[in-house]
Regions:
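Short beta-strand segments
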Residues: 10, 95-97, 147, 155, ...
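Glycine-rich beta-strand-to-loop/alpha-helix junction loops that act as flexible
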Residues: 108-109, 292-296
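ATP-binding N-lobe of GHMP and related small-molecule kinases
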Residues: 1-104, 122-126, 130, 167, ...
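Conserved, helical-rich catalytic subdomain that frames metal- and/or nucleotide-binding sites
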Residues: 54, 153-288, 303-331
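Short hydrophobic/aromatic beta-strand micro-patches
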Residues: 299-301
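DPxDG-like acidic metal-binding loop motif
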Residues: 104-134, 145-149
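Short, well-structured alpha-helical segments that form the helix of a local strand-helix-strand
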Residues: 128-139, 281, 309-312
Length: 331
């Protein structure tokens, strides 16, 4: 083991520049085609060795069995020592300073779990990269991305990752309290049910949320129970309104305005509350705005160094919370 007893790491949240839900597997997991990008909005995670057992602080209200940081420590210790506690297994203390909104669509819990895995690997070692990746995937679909960070084109359930170009220099604003917080599982279920809406209603809603493609649902594949069939989504191509390929092309141009114009997220179809926030942002200087993951947080993309005072004032006056404003220069 390393001689260090404590490590403190940043745990960056993520945004999805494009998010298309492409299907549902027989095991219930949904497949996606998405472009993920880490942000400057981070939790701070400190992991220390000593004592016995595993303790996690800073995640009040989250049960131990649902706490991804706790489960990450358990998974790592079992892989390294064969047991999460007992003789020969060090005690682990995890302290989390939360900044990423809980259930906000920015993978805050996944980011914390990934930070715990990286910290333990730094403190203890002896677990190979492949095993670390397997532990990450066992915790949740976003944890593998949070483990590596950067910018990735992700498919499968999010675990098949291909590096892509990062955003050029930009200013990011993240707005919270943009709707009712619902679990990711609930949002996927609502998107499943979206295919039952008639085409006229769907087209109207797509126009309201500013989708970049025709979002009319397709009845093909819907069973007698009204549930979308396994492996069938959208019009057979797996697309509702989002277009990861278009985003990848836009990123390759390194033109922020074009990138903002290519942003899209299928979950906006079942998150109508995000529309008002998006309009506030784009009406006050943002080149584009989009729902964060499954929501309900929303981000706005601005030119690097842009004056965002008007946008902040408009957002706060409407009763929303500005969670983060930050510049990301070139790497």
């Amino acid at each position: 083991m390393n001689c260090k007893e404590s490590v403190t790491l940043r745990a960056p949240g993520k945004i999805n520049l494009s998010l298309s839900v492409t299907g549902r597997r027989a095991d219930g997991y949904h497949t996606v085609d998405t472009v993920m990008h880490e942000t400057g909005l981070c939790d701070v995670v400190t992991v220390s060795l000593g004592g016995r057992g595993i303790s996690v602080s800073g995640t009040d209200g989250i049960a131990r069995e649902s706490n991804l940081a706790y489960r990450a420590a358990v998974g790592y210790l079992r892989a390294r020592f064969g047991a999460a506690e007992g003789d020969g297994t060090p005690g682990v203390t995890v302290e989390i300073e939360k900044h990423i909104p809980v259930s906000g669509g920015m993978a805050g819990g996944s980011a914390d779990a990934a930070a715990v895995l990286r910290a333990l690997d730094s403190l203890i070692g002896g677990v190979g990269g492949e095993t670390l990746g397997s532990i990450a995937l066992s915790l949740g679909a976003d944890v593998p991305f949070c483990l590596v960070g950067g910018a990735m084109h992700c498919t499968g359930i999010g675990e098949v990752m291909t590096p892509c170009r990062r955003l050029p220099p930009h200013r990011l604003m993240v707005v919270g309290d943009c709707g009712v917080k619902r679990s990711t599982a609930r949002m996927y279920a609502e998107l499943d049910g979206y295919a039952q809406v008639d085409a006229a209603d769907s087209e109207r809603h797509a126009e309201e949320v500013g989708s970049v493609r025709d979002a009319a649902p397709y009845a093909e594949g819907i069973g007698a129970d009204g549930v979308l069939g396994v492996g069938t989504y959208g019009n057979g191509t797996g697309a509702f309104c989002s277009d990861a390929h278009g985003m990848l092309q836009a990123l390759d141009t390194a033109e922020l305005r074009r990138i903002a114009g290519a942003m899209s997220n299928d979950f906006e179809l079942v998150n109508p509350a995000c529309t008002d926030v998006k309009r506030l942002l784009t009406g006050n200087g943002a080149l584009g705005a989009l729902l964060c993951g499954s929501g309900p947080s929303v981000f706005g993309l601005f030119e690097y160094g842009a004056d965002v005072d008007a946008a902040e004032e408009a957002v706060r006056a409407a009763g929303y919370t500005v969670l983060y404003v930050g510049d990301s220069p070139a790497d």
